[in-house]
């Protein structure tokens, strides 16, 4: 049985990848899933102002859990095995670590359309395609949902 990583960022675009995975399962794919969110690491200002790095870590983890919840709920409702992971750091590097540590065989993730915003946000998906040791399926966001 394949183990597939689905990175999510809380956007409706990320849920497109979950819906694609559900379509594949509906067509007969046997898989279990790891839904992951990578939070940005705290910057120096946040560390100084917070006075307690543990609090920042707890807030970051809670935010990540909130962001993976819809994807986990969709997959669980379909009766699929789902793990959830929240990490902090550089998204591409952390996703590569999650791939390896969880023994994932593939990645399904969304792209963010086109334009300047996509050039920044879509860079994680492009980096994953270039750097991943496993197949990466990119789910394109429909034109009517792409950012301007």
Where are these regions (language model features)?
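Intrinsically disordered or low-complexity boundary/linker segments at protein termini
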Residues: 1-19, 131-148
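Structural beta-alpha unit
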Residues: 73-107, 145-148
């Amino acid at each position: 049985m394949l183990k597939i990583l689905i990175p999510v960022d809380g956007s409706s675009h990320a849920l497109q990848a979950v819906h694609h995975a559900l379509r594949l399962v509906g067509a007969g794919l046997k898989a279990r899933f790891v839904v992951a969110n990578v939070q940005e690491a705290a910057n120096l200002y946040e560390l100084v102002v917070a006075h307690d790095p543990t609090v920042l870590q707890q807030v970051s983890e809670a935010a990540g859990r909130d962001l993976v919840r819809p994807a986990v709920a969709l997959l669980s409702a379909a009766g699929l095995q789902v793990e959830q992971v929240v990490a902090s750091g550089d998204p591409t590097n952390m996703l590569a670590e999650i791939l390896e540590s969880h023994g994932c065989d593939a990645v399904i993730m969304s792209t963010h359309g086109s334009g300047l915003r996509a050039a920044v946000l879509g860079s994680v998906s492009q980096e994953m395609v270039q750097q991943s040791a496993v197949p990466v399926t990119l789910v394109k966001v429909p034109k009517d949902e792409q950012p301007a």
